[in-house]
Design a protein with these regions (language model features):
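N-terminal export and membrane-targeting signals
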Residues: 1-14
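Extracellularly exposed regions in secreted/surface proteins, prominently low-complexity, repeat-rich
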Residues: 206-252
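Cell wall/extracellular polymer interaction/catalysis modules
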Residues: 2, 17-20, 25-210, 232, ...
């Protein structure tokens, strides 16, 4: 259980928030906008996601379609994994699946159609390349324009998440809810913290956030109901991580 002090952190520098927003969503255009309709337990999956029957959704020895190299990067203490299955190295379409580890193995808890960087994936992400970074990254901090929906992760509620007015209208609600992906950031800080330990050129501000119907600058976007489900499920005591990439890189 979070203390009152850790449950909500207020952003103090709006300018810093704009730097992070520019790194996350940019002026994405097109798409139908997030409709808030999440899918669970395999419904609504996009091509590229796991295609398995109900018998293969519980008591799994390993996270499906993730090879030994990335499995080795999942911390031993991690008992929650958000797997992002990209359709292809140059595709913006993906499927997000939440796995939770119990006494008998990994259980699939939910699945949502998603988007990643509009140019696909990369193992060497740089600012402005419009590709999402491949890898395994902790999930420690959350926030958004909207009030905390019942998150277990520390949640920063702030209007500083609001996209700039000059962005496309279909992106206006992208950051109603976000979970920071710990790529080139300092864990334990607000998602709005602009600090980039590897330098500005390596990009940053990579988040899970609401979907607007098309690719992002580097983030992974999920329907509103999916973001609400993730925020309520992800538990810092279970050391959640995201494992993300296209099919070839995930399996490699």
């Amino acid at each position: 259980m979070r203390t009152a002090g850790s449950a909500m952190r207020t952003a103090t520098v709006v300018a810093a928030g704009l730097v992070l927003l520019a790194g996350c969503g940019g002026g994405a255009s097109g798409g139908k906008g997030g409709d808030g309709k999440g899918d669970v337990a395999g419904k609504g999956e996009r091509p590229g996601g796991p295609a398995r029957g109900a018998s293969a959704t519980t008591h799994l020895k390993n996270i499906p379609e993730v090879g030994a190299a990335l499995r080795a990067r999942i911390p031993a203490g991690s008992r929650q994994v958000v797997a992002v299955y990209g359709k292809g190295v140059n595709s913006a379409e993906a499927t997000v699946v939440l796995y939770d580890k119990g006494a008998k193995g990994w259980d699939r808890k939910g699945s949502w159609a998603a988007h990643n960087g509009r140019r696909g994936w990369t193992v060497d992400h740089h600012e402005g390349d419009k590709r999402s970074p491949v890898g395994v990254f902790p999930l420690t901090d959350a926030g958004g324009v909207l009030q905390d929906p019942g998150a277990n992760l520390p949640y920063t509620h702030s209007s500083a998440f609001t996209p700039p007015s000059y962005w496309s209208k279909n992106t206006r609600h992208d950051f109603d809810y976000v979970v920071a992906i710990n790529y080139n950031r300092v864990k334990g800080t607000s998602p709005l913290d602009p600090t980039r330990p590897q330098g500005q050129s390596k990009g940053g501000g990579v988040w899970l956030h609401l979907d607007h119907g098309s690719g992002t600058s580097a983030c992974v976007s999920v329907p509103k109901a999916g973001m609400q489900a993730l925020l309520r499920a992800l538990d810092p005591a279970r050391h959640p991580v995201v494992v993300m990439g296209d099919a070839a890189h995930l399996a490699g």
